[in-house]
Regions:
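Cleavable N-terminal export/targeting peptides
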Residues: 1-38
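Hydrophobic alpha-helical segments, especially transmembrane helices
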Residues: 3-4, 8, 47, 101-102
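Short glycine/proline- and aromatic-enriched beta-strand/turn motifs that initiate or cap beta-hairpins
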Residues: 24-76, 100, 186-190
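Residues that define the transmembrane beta-barrel architecture of outer-membrane proteins
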Residues: 37-41, 52-56, 89-95, 111, ...
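Extracellular loop and loop/strand-boundary signature of outer-membrane beta-barrel proteins
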Residues: 44, 82-88, 143-148, 173
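Short polar/acidic secondary-structure junctions
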Residues: 48-50, 104, 177-179
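Gram-negative (and chloroplast) outer-membrane scaffold detector with strong preference
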Residues: 59-139, 159, 164-170, 191
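Gram-negative outer-membrane beta-barrel domains
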Residues: 149-153, 157-191
Length: 191
């Protein structure tokens, strides 16, 4: 019995194309003059705690429709490097562009899954514990780490999670943080 694999592949391709077309049309409508009238502001404050990293961030964006938000993220971060003579804290300020996608559960939209994707850069402001005094000759030496004050580090971050709407537009959210600089969890509040 000969199986025809063309039909399932063609059907899957048509479904994928139509889904992409529907999403593209939805985004196009959101950016139209009529769609921009429905935009709403969205602000969040979040804390990140991870393995060898911690920090906080503030996001400000525009909810272009009920499922999507685009905006800017700014934060203060501390990354910890293990070095020969202990630990070095790398302090930085970061800025990023982000997009958020909501997957609402139920008509009242009290519970939602979300996915944040951010692309940004962190400016290294300070190194703590990077210098030590050699007891033999009394000379101050720098630890062998790959970053220095004034460096810019680019990063990509993905933060999926669960959002719970508490009162009107006040909501809490929690989820993992998967980033090129941090692996951990985040907890925040948004309005």
């Amino acid at each position: 019995m000969k199986k025809n694999v063309f039909k399932p592949i063609a059907c899957a391709a048509i479904m994928l194309f139509s889904l992409t077309s529907v999403q593209a049309q939805s985004i196009k409508e959101s950016f139209s003059a009529e769609g921009r009238k429905n935009w709403k502001s969205e602000v969040t404050v979040r804390g990140n705690l991870g393995i060898y990293a911690s920090g906080f961030a503030v996001t400000g964006g525009v909810r272009i429709d009920e499922k999507r938000t685009l905006g800017l993220m700014a934060g203060k971060n501390v990354n910890v490097y293990t070095v020969t003579h202990g630990y070095t804290d790398v302090n930085s300020f970061s800025a990023a562009l982000y997009g958020r996608r909501y997957f609402h559960l139920g008509e009242r939209k009290i519970f939602s899954f979300y996915s944040d994707l951010a692309l940004g850069a962190a400016f290294v402001t300070d190194l703590e514990g990077a210098y030590w005094v050699d007891p033999v000759d009394g000379v101050t030496k720098k630890e062998d780490i790959s970053v220095d004050k004034g460096d810019v580090q680019f990063y990509i971050s993905w933060q999926p999670g669960v959002r719970v709407r508490c009162y009107k537009n006040l909501h809490l959210f929690l989820g993992p943080t998967l980033s090129s600089h941090c692996l951990g969890v985040h907890l925040g509040i948004g309005f």
